[in-house]
């Protein structure tokens, strides 16, 4: 049996074209139909009695799958051709059919790239811009942070400058530079108070003074500027000194309150070319002028003497206080001078009462002079009436100053005849006794005088006898008593019953 391959190929081509025309659906449906037709034709191929040809190449296999699919679809329409298909052996399609199939397959993936390209564009658009801004922000973040802190401490430095000397403080502990004096001053705190240790020309010297004071005040554990071993000699010397004494030693070692071109305390160069000595801040005054001197040392010594007189041996001086032992008065002499000074301005014994009481006691003051008052007080303290009795010249001094009112006669020294008669009567009991001038006293019943103001017992019980009262009434004391009664003061004058001698009475009347 002979088979014409050409006829079979033509019939297959015609069937394929017919199937392509009938299948106007999508590519997916044709593929499914091809799978179904392939599955249906597989048993027919296995049952064929013809000798199978050698295996076709890979492109022939693909083409064979298409041919079988088309032949299966065409078999339903033409049953007469079934025998021919079973007997026919599949063969590779002709060359022009292979090209037609390749062209057909190239049309399927042509629509796929468009969505892929669109998806890629959507994926690439949002991603690139995101990382770039983040990188830029991180790069610029660190630089702006450092600039703000530096300007803050600058205003604090400006505040310190207002404090004046504190703006140029030293690097050493307890040392400060003062522009007003141009020196380095050292201070230390003790019991809540700042103790001045002195002014120095260099900060190093001021720091040394502070270290010595700190060791003295706080012990070897104190915070100091230099090593503790540098002050071993000073520690041995300061054991026998108190804090105050040691501070005075440090101040003497300093340059003191130097002004101008002088290195001594309290000395300055005057515009006239001489050296002026003055002591400041004493008794609330700005300074005390001590004079001009030809040499700087003389002015410094004048300052030292004035400081010792005002502040004692503990005064801060330019030189050792022992150098002025022969030039300064001793303590006893200084005390004596103070006593004389106080007595010269003290009130007399008769006026030691209160001002109110003196104003209502008829103004009877015996002692008016400061000199007489001081002599009287000294004699009263010594309790030596005989010494006063031997001084007749004191009597006229007591009557130098008349009373305040001249219209009324002086009650102590009456100048009328009645007073002379009373004195003659009182003189008869004892004519040889002379009564000193201080025998007359003023006594107030409301305010009796203290006992120590009466050096001699002038008063007795007989002073209130009728004879004494009548004598007082007949004398000039009657007017004083009347005035005292009007003033509601019962002040009387008592005297010794022994009347004064004729010499004293005559001397008394002669004076008036």
Swiss-Prot record:
Residue ranges, annotated region (Disordered): 1-100, 119-174, 347-367, 401-433, 460-512
Q: Where is the composition biased (Low complexity)?
A: 39-50, 460-492
**What GO MF terms are annotated?**
DNA binding; DNA-binding transcription factor activity
| Span of the annotated motif EAR | 341-345
Q: Which gene encodes it?
A: AP2-1
User: Which Gene Ontology CC terms are recorded?
Assistant: nucleus
**Where is composition skewed (Pro residues) in this entry?**
51-60, 141-154
Has the keyword Transport been applied to this entry? no
What is this protein's name? APETALA2-like protein 1
Q: What is its main location?
A: nucleus
Bias kind Polar residues: ranges: 21-32
- Identify the taxonomic lineage of the organism of origin: Eukaryota, Viridiplantae, Streptophyta, Embryophyta, Tracheophyta
Q: Where is the composition biased (Basic and acidic residues)?
A: 127-137, 418-430
Where does the motif Nuclear localization signal lie?
Answer: 159-168
Q: Where is the composition biased (Acidic residues)?
A: 78-88
What is known about its subunit structure? Answer: May form homodimer. Interacts with TPR2/ASP1.
Which Pfam families has this protein been placed in? AP2
Instruction: Indicate where this protein resides in the cell.
Output: Nucleus
The record's comment on protein family reads: Belongs to the AP2/ERF transcription factor family. AP2 subfamily.
* Alphabetical keyword list: DNA-binding, Nucleus, Repeat, Transcription, Transcription regulation
- InterPro entries with a match to the protein in the record: AP2/ERF_dom, AP2/ERF_dom_sf, DNA-bd_dom_sf
Function according to Swiss-Prot or TrEMBL: Probable transcription factor. Involved in spikelet transition. Regulator of starch biosynthesis especially during seed development (e.g. endosperm starch granules); represses the expression of type I starch synthesis genes. Prevents lemma and palea elongation as well as grain growth.
State the DNA-binding region(s).
171-227, 263-320
């Amino acid at each position: 049996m002979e088979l014409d391959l050409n006829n079979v190929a033509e019939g297959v081509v015609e069937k394929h074209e017919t199937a392509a025309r009938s299948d106007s659906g999508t590519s997916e449906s044709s593929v499914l139909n091809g799978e179904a037709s392939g599955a249906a034709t597989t048993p027919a191929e296995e049952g064929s009695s013809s000798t199978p040809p050698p295996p076709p190449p890979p492109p022939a296999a693909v083409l064979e799958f298409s041919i079988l699919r088309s032949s299966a679809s065409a078999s339903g329409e033409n049953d007469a051709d079934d025998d021919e298909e079973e007997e026919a052996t599949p063969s590779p399609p002709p060359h022009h059919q292979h090209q037609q199939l390749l062209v057909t397959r190239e049309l399927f993936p042509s629509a796929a790239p468009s969505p892929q390209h669109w998806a890629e564009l959507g994926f690439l658009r949002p991603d690139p811009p995101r990382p770039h801004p983040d990188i830029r922000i991180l790069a610029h973040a660190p630089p702006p942070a450092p600039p703000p802190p530096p300007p803050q401490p600058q205003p604090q430095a400006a505040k310190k400058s207002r404090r004046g000397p504190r703006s140029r403080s030293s690097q050493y502990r307890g040392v400060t530079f003062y522009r007003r004096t141009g020196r380095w001053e050292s201070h230390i705190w003790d019991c809540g108070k700042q103790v001045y240790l002195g002014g120095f020309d260099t900060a190093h010297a001021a720091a040394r003074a502070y270290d010595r004071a700190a060791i003295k005040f706080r012990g070897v554990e104190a915070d100091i500027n230099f090593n503790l071993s540098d002050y071993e000699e000073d520690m041995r010397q300061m054991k026998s000194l108190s804090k105050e004494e040691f501070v005075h030693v440090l101040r003497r070692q300093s340059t003191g309150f130097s002004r101008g071109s002088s290195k001594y305390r309290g000395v300055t160069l005057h515009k006239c070319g001489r050296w002026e000595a003055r002591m400041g801040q004493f008794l609330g005054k700005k300074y005390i002028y001590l004079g001009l001197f030809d040499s700087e040392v003389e002015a410094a010594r004048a300052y030292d003497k004035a400081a010792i007189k005002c502040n004692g041996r503990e005064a801060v001086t330019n030189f050792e206080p022992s150098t002025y032992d022969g030039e300064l008065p001793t303590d006893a002499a200084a005390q004596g001078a103070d006593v004389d000074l106080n007595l010269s301005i003290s009130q007399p014994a008769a006026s030691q009462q209160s001002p109110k009481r003196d104003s209502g006691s008829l103004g009877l003051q015996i002692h008016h002079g400061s000199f007489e008052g001081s002599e009287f007080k000294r004699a009263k303290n010594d309790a030596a009436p005989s010494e006063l009795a031997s001084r007749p010249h004191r009597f006229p001094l007591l009557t130098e100053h008349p009373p305040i009112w001249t219209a009324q006669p002086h009650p102590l020294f009456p100048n009328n005849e009645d007073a002379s008669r009373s004195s003659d009567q009182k003189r008869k009991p004892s004519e040889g006794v002379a009564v000193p001038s201080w025998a007359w006293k003023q006594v107030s019943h409301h305010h009796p005088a203290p006992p120590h103001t009466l050096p001699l017992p002038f008063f007795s019980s007989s002073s209130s006898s009728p004879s004494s009262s009548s004598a007082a009434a007949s004398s000039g004391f009657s007017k004083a008593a009347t005035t005292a009664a009007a003033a509601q003061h019962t002040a009387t004058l008592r005297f010794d019953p022994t009347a004064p001698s004729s010499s004293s009475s005559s001397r008394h009347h002669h004076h008036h």
